[in-house]
Amino acid sequence: MSRLEAKKPSLCKSEPLTTERVRTTLSVLKRIVTSCYGPSGRLKQLHNGFGGYVCTTSQSSALLSHLLVTHPILKILTASIQNHVSSFSDCGLFTAILCCNLIENVQRLGLTPTTVIRLNKHLLSLCISYLKSETCGCRIPVDFSSTQILLCLVRSILTSKPACMLTRKETEHVSALILRAFLLTIPENAEGHIILGKSLIVPLKGQRVIDSTVLPGILIEMSEVQLMRLLPIKKSTALKVALFCTTLSGDTSDTGEGTVVVSYGVSLENAVLDQLLNLGRQLISDHVDLVLCQKVIHPSLKQFLNMHRIIAIDRIGVTLMEPLTKMTGTQPIGSLGSICPNSYGSVKDVCTAKFGSKHFFHLIPNEATICSLLLCNRNDTAWDELKLTCQTALHVLQLTLKEPWALLGGGCTETHLAAYIRHKTHNDPESILKDDECTQTELQLIAEAFCSALESVVGSLEHDGGEILTDMKYGHLWSVQADSPCVANWPDLLSQCGCGLYNSQEELNWSFLRSTRRPFVPQSCLPHEAVGSASNLTLDCLTAKLSGLQVAVETANLILDLSYVIEDKN
């Protein structure tokens, strides 16, 4: 018997944020996420030391899922961001950068964690209240009767992901397809509570991006030989569909729970086949036109159905079961017994289609709330990133449908918000502190650390040595290229602000980001004509941004409040 190793005592560390190891690892994580941020963010290649799949990305969801972290504090931070991204899809890097900078900034102040956390909560509440208010100067309404703002929102997501490797023309094409795919999921006669359909992304790797398209209904990939064997159906009415979630292969090992009793001298295989053929006879008598099976259909049953001009398709997989149920109105059949008439559904029509080298069986719905986005890209790496980006964009559109507002992007919301907080804390600190135990000096220190963290997110957009400025009227971001001459006439160097709403021809005064300047009131209440005339805005999802802001501050507060880290080393 081998000797058992004695248990090691748990490792207990006090004041974890004061250790050099923790500060270094936080700094490394911050540099990784910061370098990925924005349209010119740098790509990361992630792979393990034993080879295998290599992930090339700049997206937080792919980055953090492939990034192995071991320190408990980093695990808290990455888990918080991953939970946010799993719920909202967008603003993961924003959340990570803001959280890391908040932790770094307040550590330098020497204030007690209790004071820092209390004031951070006040500032977070101030931010959320302002961003949700009617007077907010960086929030615009989204009109679903017009595609202009919706296209801007989708385009902003695509352009922020450089690993997709899209040209401007390709970006416009894919943006329009994503928007069309989303609009197809909205029921035409929706009243009250809306139940959205689903957009399925079908891979077409190695094809031109411009060949991507959207089709109503579901595409089932098949070989050319299989398609040739399918009999054409000519019918003026809808086609009746039966959908099976159990195997029709006759395999007795897949009978589900329970006991199979077989009489002596009876062939089990023949008994099961007879039952399958009886099932086929019921399908024929019920005038079914199309049989779909998640698993395998026995060749004899398939031939029997084909003889009676019923199309039978098997091995469709679990992924398509939910969309097929929604689109056809079927109830998946899970047994070989008698079929309830309510289990059947229908489709408007079926046809075959070919895209690139792939062949598909196309199910055309009665009502187009399920659609297929055939997504093309040059190679596997670019396609994987584009697929993830399209899923993000579709989710953002769903969130925007629930809360039809968008925030100005390109860093303008962050600089505007920082200007608003500075003005509020300098000119009306009593409204923030109220009956709190904190002093105005502590509020000024924390507010500056908070605003500096917001501006650090903005600074992360610049990766090529350029300068970032803010104007003293709107509080928006303006970028200057690294090789620009140092002149006082900024309008000659600046064209548009980060979000694209304002141009430099207005009478504006600028200052460098993070430079010392007097607090000012950023203009609120966006003029309707300014928003309506802008056709190429950079926008962010309001719901995702608010959640990211909240997660960043709350996670930073949680980490700052840690007094001990206890690790079980066994």
Swiss-Prot record:
Source species, domain of life: Eukaryota
Residues noted as binding ATP in the record, renumbered to the chain: G192, H193, I194, I195, L196, G197, K198, S199
Arranged from A to Z, the UniProt key words for this protein are: ATP-binding, Bardet-Biedl syndrome, Chaperone, Ciliopathy, Cytoplasm, Cytoskeleton, Disease variant, Intellectual disability, Nucleotide-binding, Nucleus, Obesity, Sensory transduction, Vision
Record SUPFAM superfamilies? GroEL apical domain-like, GroEL equatorial domain-like
Q: What is the effect of changing G52D?
A: In BBS6; fails to associate with centrosome
Effect listed in the UniProt record for changing A488T: In a patient with Bardet-Biedl syndrome compound heterozygote for mutations in BBS12; uncertain significance
Transmembrane domains' residue ranges: none
Question: Matching Pfam families, A to Z?
Answer: Cpn60_TCP1 (PF00118)
Extract one GO BP annotation from the record. photoreceptor cell maintenance
Q: Where does it live in the cell?
A: Cytoplasm, Cytoskeleton, Microtubule organizing center, Centrosome; Cytoplasm, Cytosol; Nucleus
Q: What does the record give under GO molecular function?
A: ATP binding; RNA polymerase II-specific DNA-binding transcription factor binding; unfolded protein binding
Q: What is its main location?
A: cytoplasm
Q: What does this protein do?
A: Probable molecular chaperone that assists the folding of proteins upon ATP hydrolysis. Plays a role in the assembly of BBSome, a complex involved in ciliogenesis regulating transports vesicles to the cilia. May play a role in protein processing in limb, cardiac and reproductive system development. May play a role in cytokinesis.
Q: Which PANTHER family match?
A: MOLECULAR CHAPERONE MKKS (PTHR46787:SF1), SYNDROMES PUTATIVE CHAPERONIN-RELATED (PTHR46787)
| Oligomeric form and interacting partners | Component of a complex composed at least of MKKS, BBS10, BBS12, TCP1, CCT2, CCT3, CCT4, CCT5 and CCT8. Interacts with STUB1. Interacts with BBS2 (via coiled coil domain). Interacts with CCDC28B. Interacts with BBS12. Interacts with SMARCC1, a component of the SWI/SNF complexes; the interaction takes place predominantly in the cytoplasm and may modulate SMARCC1 location. Interacts with DLEC1.
| Name of this protein | Molecular chaperone MKKS
